[in-house]
Amino acid sequence: MSTSRSDALKAEADRSDNDVEKLLRPQSLDEFVGQEKIKENLNVFMKAALQRGETLDHVLLSGPPGLGKTTLAHIIANEMGARIRTSSGPVLEKPADIAGVLTNLEEGDLLFIDEIHRLSSVVEEYLYSAMEDYRIDIVIDQGPNARTVQIDLPPFTMVGATTRKGLLTAPLRARFGIDFRYDYYTADLLQEITQRSARILDVETTPDGAYEIARRSRGTPRVANRLLRRTRDFAEVEGDGEITKAIADRALNALDVDEEGLDDMDARILLTLIDNFDGGPTGLKNLAVSVGEESGTLEEVYEPYLIQEGFMERTPQGRVALQRAYDHFDRSSPAADQDLFDQE
């Protein structure tokens, strides 16, 4: 297959996956499964703002990727009857970029900035007055002819999403009146999400088939929906189209997703810690180089779940594998080896 043909097929597949993700995305708080505390509080805040005829206060959504931050931003826009404008931290490189976005907002609009922790400090400073006073100051010309022009903005709602809240500066965090942190989902909630997605995709699933996908989805709806789509492929090719527990187990094993929901990279991280670094501690950069992945990806995508589930921990000295990791891969821990040595 030619490179151009391969690239074209990949682009088409990416578009298809994006279309499916949009199709599966809940459109209202009632459709949104899980994160009950966030939903309850947000419902109150939105109703109060609507009753007062005001825009909703600025909202910060933080937590690991794939838990529904972007989805909730769109739901807020739907519930508030607002137009949503979307961007991301890496795209807004210069003051002119953010100024262009802000000056095109209309009253009541919702501006969603994903990966807001990746905004440059210069761009971030423009947001301070925009969020607090609904105005920005733009410098016209250069040198002795330079002058500042103040532009008033209509009231709007900023929704920022981040996987690394700690990287946000204190002044920016302080300008968000509503601050929510996402938790990982339970297997039962993910089963509910999986069954809802299956109905939308017109895929037959048994309850235990949906649960098998759910419990091996790293507590993450995005992962559950992705595994559902891939399991559907196995059900159609190797079965009668219905996702049963047996089909789900077959598909997930073929995708290198083990009984604990760990994928190939999870295993590489933990086994590298155990085998190459004697369980740790070792630094993030050393670990990233050893497994061939970006340190930021390890820290944002993989480590939160492994830490949450007790496979590893972060210490001041570095990353350390915990006993559950040794047990999972049937390895003997240094502590167990020492106990055995002491008994001899």
UniProtKB/Swiss-Prot annotation:
User: Record keywords: DNA damage included?
Assistant: yes
**What EC number(s) is this enzyme filed under?**
3.6.4.-
Kindly state which reaction or reactions the protein catalyses.
Answer: ATP + H2O = ADP + phosphate + H(+)
Binding-site residues for Mg(2+), renumbered to this chain: T70
Q: Which InterPro entries match?
A: AAA+_ATPase (IPR003593), AAA_lid_4 (IPR041445), DNA_helicase_Holl-junc_RuvB (IPR004605), P-loop_NTPase (IPR027417), RuvB-like_N (IPR008824), RuvB_C (IPR008823), WH-like_DNA-bd_sf (IPR036388), WH_DNA-bd_sf (IPR036390)
Give each disulfide bond as a residue pair: none
Which residue ranges does the record annotate as region Small ATPAse domain (RuvB-S)? 186-256
Which residues are involved in binding DNA? R314, R319
Q: Which stretches does the entry tag as region Large ATPase domain (RuvB-L)? A: 1-185
Please indicate if the UniProt record lists Protein biosynthesis as a keyword.
no
Please report a single Pfam family linked to this protein. Answer: RuvB_C
Q: Which GO terms describe its biological process?
A: DNA recombination; DNA repair
Enzyme class, top EC level, equals hydrolase
SUPFAM superfamilies assigned to the protein according to its UniProt record, in alphabetical order: P-loop containing nucleoside triphosphate hydrolases (SSF52540), Winged helix' DNA-binding domain (SSF46785)
Q: Which GO terms describe its cellular component?
A: cytoplasm; Holliday junction resolvase complex
What are the start and end residues of every segment in region (Head domain (RuvB-H))? 259-344
Q: What does this protein do?
A: The RuvA-RuvB-RuvC complex processes Holliday junction (HJ) DNA during genetic recombination and DNA repair, while the RuvA-RuvB complex plays an important role in the rescue of blocked DNA replication forks via replication fork reversal (RFR). RuvA specifically binds to HJ cruciform DNA, conferring on it an open structure. The RuvB hexamer acts as an ATP-dependent pump, pulling dsDNA into and through the RuvAB complex. RuvB forms 2 homohexamers on either side of HJ DNA bound by 1 or 2 RuvA tetramers; 4 subunits per hexamer contact DNA at a time.
Family that this chain belongs to: Belongs to the RuvB family.
Under the subunit heading, UniProt states: Homohexamer. Forms an RuvA(8)-RuvB(12)-Holliday junction (HJ) complex. HJ DNA is sandwiched between 2 RuvA tetramers; dsDNA enters through RuvA and exits via RuvB. An RuvB hexamer assembles on each DNA strand where it exits the tetramer. Each RuvB hexamer is contacted by two RuvA subunits (via domain III) on 2 adjacent RuvB subunits; this complex drives branch migration. In the full resolvosome a probable DNA-RuvA(4)-RuvB(12)-RuvC(2) complex forms which resolves the HJ.
- Free-text comment on this protein's domains from its UniProt entry: Has 3 domains, the large (RuvB-L) and small ATPase (RuvB-S) domains and the C-terminal head (RuvB-H) domain. The head domain binds DNA, while the ATPase domains jointly bind ATP, ADP or are empty depending on the state of the subunit in the translocation cycle. During a single DNA translocation step the structure of each domain remains the same, but their relative positions change.
What PANTHER family does the database record attribute to this sequence? Answer: HOLLIDAY JUNCTION BRANCH MIGRATION COMPLEX SUBUNIT RUVB, PTHR42848
The protein, known as: Holliday junction branch migration complex subunit RuvB
| Gene that encodes the chain | ruvB
